Amino acid sequence: MLFRSHMSGSDAYVNVAGGIKVSEPALDLGIVMALVSSFKNRAIDEKTVIFGEVGLAGEVRAVSQAQQRVNEAVKLGFKTCILPGVCLKNIKKNDKIEIIGVNNVQEAIKLI
């Protein structure tokens, strides 16, 4: 069962840092996780990076340039990366960052 909340009566405002393309579908999962984190009052570790496109049924879809995104996360000092499970086959192992693949929003929510 997917995460269900009583957020329908709430407004959510998302502020995106300058220079980030808001049309980038890889932002979806990070935004969903930020909203769930706020609603559940549980912080996501500041050394965790999250990316992936989210479909209407809650599935987490692949995004382009997954390896480059992971490489950049390592350069920026992130220790954990949550990404689409289908991208795992194209990601090289790296001892500097833990890579966690998720196939749907429910799996991602269990991580916080």
Which residues fall in each region the model found?
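Peripheral, non-AAA+ core regions of ATP-driven protein-machinery
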Residues: 1-112
